[in-house]
């Protein structure tokens, strides 16, 4: 059934006022088998709408190669929401932020020297239009005007915190309209003068993003002539980055009070209702005084936990919705997905990463090249060279390198440099003797591209310039791209993992029946874990996250296979537990 949706003095659906109480669920952070469970729990809390971003890089990981299947099937997610009686807000903006790798932008954009992002640079816009030619026709039939559940779509995301290119915003608006988007278009920005002013574009409705003081925020928006009032992102929690000292939590009662006030004053989208998990290597990062990569979990201290459990915040939000709307939440039969501890996994084989990588195709160059120039976006890049003369290694500098580099001489780590340590030369406390024929390997990890701030364009990964040994540049490098696919295809044999070098470990465990579980890695250092070929995500002893979430659909009844890349030359026990540990 087709509907009309209009923004006037309020939101009107088929001529009747609609009070939007929405919650964010990112389809790309939840296994498809659990979409129904999460959406039903959203409805049962009293929400009438679900909101999601659409990350460009998740759907076009390589230029011109699109994927809208499985976990990427946004159309199926939207249709399921409709079948369950929910309206939908879509945010198909080129940039999403969202604590997601590169804010959703594809890293292959950075292969073009000098390209400017999120502006009217014709090189950037050409790629956006190619993407829209594929994406937007998929979304058009999902609009309420075509019988779907989509009420509105977003043009750009928090652009007022980034730039002021009005021509760019107008181009995005027009591109969506020309491709058939006829529901209202929106933007979302912080409710501050510069942000609202820079993010504004004619013919597009403005919304605000904030986590508290709704009365003051909305009053300011009213002064700027914005009506009706909507908070597109009510931040009810926050995200974690490695080493931040503990899982970010907000007081449930005070958060519920803020939420109740917000419902009284206008329309709201809860960010996040359910955070989910940044599976794979898709976590983003912030970079202020130092790089701060996000952890694998995107629990966000949301009303619904990472594994879909109802929290105190959920119950308080539900009560607030019922009290403010005067209607009880829909009666929805909810299930609690079982958890199970499967015990200790058994290691079956291990091998040095350098040995396993030796047979891979490599690119040869005079000087090192960045991941992006090598056609790689995520993972690790290995730079290998043979030293030609005898000398003493006193000083080493990796020029234009990011994010974390492990320097190995003949297979043994002699130096690890991270983030700001890569900005200058490193002087060895004890000089390292080098002989002709010695092999120098440098393994560089992309720990997550920054997803917010002006630094978006300035973050090629790997080594993008030179390696300076003592006081001279070293030339002649073989470069191997070790992305998720390449690493997960490696098969360790035997049990030969040196104590001071990256290695891959194979393990197995038995699951008599499938249930949610949590992977604990006591004694391990840093790396990535795969389960039955699926990338669960990163681990790091720095915390705060101590266990990785494993949804039941990823398990097999019977034997399950784990592959662990451990970059610190460590090993320990591996346990499958029935409780999370986010720190």
Describe the residue ranges of each PLM region:
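Aromatic- and acidic-residue-enriched segments that line the glycan-binding/catalytic groove
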Residues: 64-70, 94-118, 169, 173, ...
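The substrate-binding groove and active-site-proximal loops of carbohydrate-active enzymes
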Residues: 20-32, 56-74, 110-130, 154-165, ...
């Amino acid at each position: 059934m087709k509907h009309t949706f209009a923004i006037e003095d309020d939101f009107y659906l088929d001529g009747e006022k609609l009070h939007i109480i929405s919650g964010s669920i990112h389809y790309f952070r939840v296994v498809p088998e659990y979409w129904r469970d999460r959406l039903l729990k959203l409805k049962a809390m009293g929400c009438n709408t679900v909101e999601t971003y659409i990350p460009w890089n998740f759907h076009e990981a390589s230029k011109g190669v699109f994927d809208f299947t499985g976990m990427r099937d946004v159309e199926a997610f939207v249709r399921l929401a409709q079948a369950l009686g929910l309206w939908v807000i879509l945010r198909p903006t080129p940039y999403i932020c969202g604590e997601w790798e590169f804010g959703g932008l594809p890293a292959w954009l950075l292969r073009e020297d000098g390209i400017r992002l999120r502006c009217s640079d014709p090189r950037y816009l050409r790629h956006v239009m190619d993407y829209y030619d594929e994406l937007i026709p998929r979304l058009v039939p999902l609009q309420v005007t075509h019988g779907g559940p989509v009420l509105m779509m977003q043009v750009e995301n928090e652009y007022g915190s980034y730039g002021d290119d009005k021509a760019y915003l107008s181009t995005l608006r027009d591109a969506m309209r020309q491709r058939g988007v006829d529901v209202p278009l929106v933007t979302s920005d912080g409710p501050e003068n510069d942000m609202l002013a820079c993010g504004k574009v004619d013919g597009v409705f403005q919304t605000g993003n904030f986590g508290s003081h709704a009365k003051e925020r909305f009053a300011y928006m009213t002064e700027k002539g914005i009506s009706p009032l909507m908070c597109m992102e009510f931040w009810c929690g926050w995200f974690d980055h490695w080493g931040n000292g503990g899982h970010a939590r907000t007081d449930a009662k005070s958060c519920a009070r803020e939420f109740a006030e917000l419902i009284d004053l206008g329309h709201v989208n809860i960010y996040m209702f359910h955070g989910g998990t940044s599976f794979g290597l898709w976590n983003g990062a912030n970079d202020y005084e130092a790089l701060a990569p996000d952890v694998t979990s995107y629990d966000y201290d949301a009303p619904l936990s990472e594994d879909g459990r109802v929290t105190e915040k959920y119950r308080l939000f539900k009560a607030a919705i019922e009290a403010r709307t005067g209607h009880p939440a829909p009666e929805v039969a909810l299930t609690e997905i079982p958890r199970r501890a499967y015990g200790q996994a058994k290691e079956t084989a291990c091998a040095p990463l350098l040995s396993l990588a030796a047979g891979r195709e490599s690119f040869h160059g005079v000087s090192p090249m960045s991941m992006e120039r090598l056609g790689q976006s995520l993972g690790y890049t290995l730079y290998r060279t043979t030293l030609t003369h005898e000398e003493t290694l006193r000083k080493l500098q990796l020029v234009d390198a990011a994010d974390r580099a492990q320097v190995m001489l003949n297979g043994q780590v002699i130096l690890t440099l991270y983030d700001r340590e890569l900005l200058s030369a490193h002087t060895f406390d004890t000089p390292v003797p080098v002989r002709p024929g010695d092999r120098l390997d440098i393994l560089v990890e992309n720990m997550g591209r920054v997803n917010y701030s002006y630094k978006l364009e300035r973050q090629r990964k790997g080594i993008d310039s030179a390696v300076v040994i003592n006081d001279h540049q070293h030339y002649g490098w073989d470069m191997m791209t070790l992305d998720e696919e390449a690493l997960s295809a490696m098969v360790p044999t035997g049990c030969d993992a040196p104590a001071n070098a990256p290695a891959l470990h194979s393990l197995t465990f038995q699951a008599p029946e499938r249930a949610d579980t949590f992977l604990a890695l006591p004694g391990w250092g840093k790396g990535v874990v795969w389960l039955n070929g699926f990338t669960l995500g990163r681990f790091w002893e720095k915390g705060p996250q101590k266990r990785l979430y494993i949804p039941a659909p990823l398990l097999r009844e019977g034997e399950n296979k784990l592959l662990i890349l451990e970059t610190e030359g460590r090993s320990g026990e591996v346990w499958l537990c029935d409780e999370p540990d986010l720190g």
